[in-house]
Amino acid sequence: MVERSQHLQDVFLNTVRKQKISLTIFLVNGVKLTGIVTSFDNFCVLLRRDGHAQLVYKHAISTIMPGQPVQMFEGESSE
């Protein structure tokens, strides 16, 4: 079986999407967004909060902070 390499951002976003972890996203212009990732692709992230969706382009994102620890890989301790 050929193992395909995954980008760290894809692993991170897919993990927080599956676990429905709330995120705080800071944009390069200083705007702070919060919500849950419902989908993402190479160029954007779909964020949902209070029944509203926001499409955020990745080039506008500065920092992503999860609301709780994220275990992205098997065997990773939560220390």
Swiss-Prot record:
Q: Which GO terms describe its molecular function?
A: RNA binding
**GO annotations of cellular component type:** cytosol
Describe the location of the Sm domain by residue ranges.
10-70
Instruction: Kindly state which keywords UniProt assigns to this record, in alphabetical order.
Output: RNA-binding, Stress response
Entries under SUPFAM superfamilies matching the protein: Sm-like ribonucleoproteins (SSF50182)
GO BP annotations, alphabetical order: regulation of DNA-templated transcription; regulation of RNA stability; regulation of translation, ncRNA-mediated
Could you describe the subunit structure of this protein? Homohexamer.
Q: Which family does it belong to?
A: Belongs to the Hfq family.
Entries under NCBIfam families matching the protein: Hfq, PRK00395.1
What is the role of this chain? RNA chaperone that binds small regulatory RNA (sRNAs) and mRNAs to facilitate mRNA translational regulation in response to envelope stress, environmental stress and changes in metabolite concentrations. Also binds with high specificity to tRNAs.
What is this protein called in UniProt? Answer: RNA-binding protein Hfq
Lineage of the native species? Bacteria, Pseudomonadati, Pseudomonadota, Alphaproteobacteria, Hyphomicrobiales
The encoding gene is hfq
